Amino acid sequence: MPSSRIPALCLGAWLLLLLLPRFARAEGAVPIPVTCFTRGLDIRKEKADVLCPGGCSLEEFSVFGNIVYASVSSICGAAVHRGVIGTSGGPVRVYSLPGRENYSSVDANGIQSQMLSRWSASFAVTKGKSSTQEATGRAVSTAHPPSGKRLKKTPEKKTGNKDCKADIAFLIDGSFNIGQRRFNLQKNFVGKVALMLGIGTEGPHVGLVQASEHPKIEFYLKNFTSAKDVLFAIKEVGFRGGNSNTGKALKHTAQKFFTADTGVRKGIPKVVVVFIDGWPSDDIEEAGIVAREFGVNVFIVSVAKPIPEELGMVQDVAFVDKAVCRNNGFFSYHMPNWFGTTKYVKPLVQKLCTHEQMMCSKTCYNSVNIAFLIDGSSSVGDSNFRLMLEFVSNIAKTFEISDIGAKIAAVQFTYDQRTEFSFTDYNTKENVLAVLANIRYMSGGTATGDAIAFTVRNVFGPIRDSPNKNFLVIVTDGQSYDDVRGPAAAAHDAGITIFSVGVAWAPLDDLRDMASKPKESHAFFTREFTGLEPIVSDVIRGICRDFLESQQ
């Protein structure tokens, strides 16, 4: 938009706000109770009186613009931002307005509104008519309104598809090469994919970047958490033109899009789906390297591959193989053209929801199963047992524990074995550490061999198909009364890497017999229980080293 038009738009907005009170002298209707999640687009009237609850100044209630707000904004959040109501809520009058461009970002009254390049409808707010109803710190019940009619309840935010956890950026082609018509077909396809993903607060989150002469982030992961809002946002994206510069756009997306401030979630795979119509106009290999370094899984959706006569214009005919996360066929996807693409939606969604295949997100911190086998024999003693638990906790807290990330389990042994918790019992670091801290000391003899066999069978057995790499960390202070070599060898054969940590009277021969190869880097010993702390970093480094070697 020309800069000369911006002051005119701002002046128009101010004149509109000055005139609004003249039109506000209406019938004394009772304000309709709404929630903080109610948006401008939920109000179907040109003018409406609503009653906002308190607590609508939180960041989750998104606001786009200043003075004039995009209709996707929270009404009550906008009212707080505008200064019409305070944090305790109150009556608000809402006026529906046409759409516009360049909704500005302004920090006002404790709310940082967000920028939006364009939206199809807007609204403005003024102070509403007072009523006998008063806003409280919670949403007002709409079960029995004064009119006696049941009001339609504002729907709560959907959790989404919990089996498809991913933070996804769609990088669409906005170049002159694709043109306006195919650009719109591309947007329709992306909308269908977004709808099938099952977007929600606990499911996939999506954002959109347009590749053109200069890349533009159209909206971030945090902006929308419902499919309906995402579809609206995709519809409003305008065609930019210019060269595609896909490499430049991919690099920009990898570096700028996936941050905590823009809504990326810890432990969730980061994905970029790159749409290329024909071929990129710049080098894309370096951008693919940068994306992998940032832990981003790059998918390439190529449309209308170059014909033999056009190959001379392509900088690198192997651009797909060099840009994707892994050149194994999983991360590349081809469609012959933009017509009749519905049949391609589901296969792409299935790929995006297969988190165990997201190789570029896999690290030693989020893709391992670690079981701790803890000696609870009488020779340890209660105070030293607490030091052993502290050692275990210090290792466990380093890893990204989640339902799709690292898993932790613990078994205590004497002559008997007790599963303190299995891999599937706790999916958060906080819960794992809390349970570890409260394990009760058993006391008894030492049968380490039986304990290894028990752990392989009962702890690792149920998760034998897990994509994570398996590790067993054994902590013991004495000689086992049974053989450890046979059970340890069986564990090695089952793909379990063993680290043995001995204290005090633990025989070095037993530690080496249990440890994986090379023995020198998988077996550790300390004379005192206080000497366990320095070994924490050795075990963590060893786990990461073994994990990286397994990925090569």
Swiss-Prot record:
Q: Where in the cell is it found?
A: Secreted, Extracellular space
Entry-linked PROSITE patterns: LCCL, VWFA
UniProt entry keywords in alphabetical sequence: Disulfide bond, Glycoprotein, Hearing, Repeat, Secreted, Signal
Q: Which GO terms describe its molecular function?
A: collagen binding
> Residue ranges of the LCCL domain?
30-123
Which Pfam family, giving just one, matches this sequence? VWA
VWFA domain spans which residues? Answer: 167-352, 369-539
Q: What is this protein called?
A: Cochlin
Q: Origin organism of this chain?
A: Mus musculus
